[in-house]
Amino acid sequence: MSRRLDLDALDLSTKTIPAQAAIGTYMSSTIIKAPASSVWQAVNDTDSWPIWNTFCPGATIREQPDTTKSRSGRLQLGTKMTLHLNWNPRGTKPKQMDVGLVVTEFDPPIKGRETPGRIAWATDSSAKGFPSWLLYAERVTELHESEEWDGEECQSVTQVLSWESQRGPLAYVVRWFMGKNFKMCLRVQADDMTSFVEGQKL
């Protein structure tokens, strides 16, 4: 049975930023006709991002907590990375920006479990860039799997909910001057993910 989320009733709090304390919150949602495990693979494997992720076409892993996976592009709890963002994902001239982040939550989806799969990353104070008191951001991605009838059989579908909350003085600048574009970029990323994951099934 489908259990799609009511986007107007969500609590968009992150681990460290309550919803009511966020200066800016930017969200996207998409339905992917695939199990949550397939979506998790796309989100978690940064080596695949250049193939499908036009908003964030690359990530440099700066540090892995598990030294046996130090050269792996797969995220884990505590991974420190630099995201290479493109703020013009549908244009011909990229607008690039690098952001240092650390994975703060890592909970892969489990078939049949009520709670969603969830991964989050946040501003890494040890990386180059704005100090965290000036701009602190936390990005959460949740994978909610359910079953839907397609007229012939039940199939697994995943509702991907992704949002970023920000605080600090520069968060006002982002909201005023970049908020609309940020929402567009998240929408593009959601569409890209949907096309990529569903295409993997072919």
From Swiss-Prot:
<dbReference type="InterPro" id="IPR005031">
    <property type="entry name" value="COQ10_START"/>
</dbReference>
<dbReference type="InterPro" id="IPR023393">
    <property type="entry name" value="START-like_dom_sf"/>
</dbReference>
<comment type="function">
    <text>Part of the gene cluster that mediates the biosynthesis of oxopyrrolidines, polyketide-amino acid hybrid compounds with feature structures of tetramic acid. Does not seem to play a role in oxopyrrolidines A and B biosynthesis.</text>
</comment>
<protein>
    <recommendedName>
        <fullName>Oxopyrrolidines biosynthesis cluster protein O</fullName>
    </recommendedName>
</protein>
<dbReference type="Pfam" id="PF03364">
    <property type="entry name" value="Polyketide_cyc"/>
</dbReference>
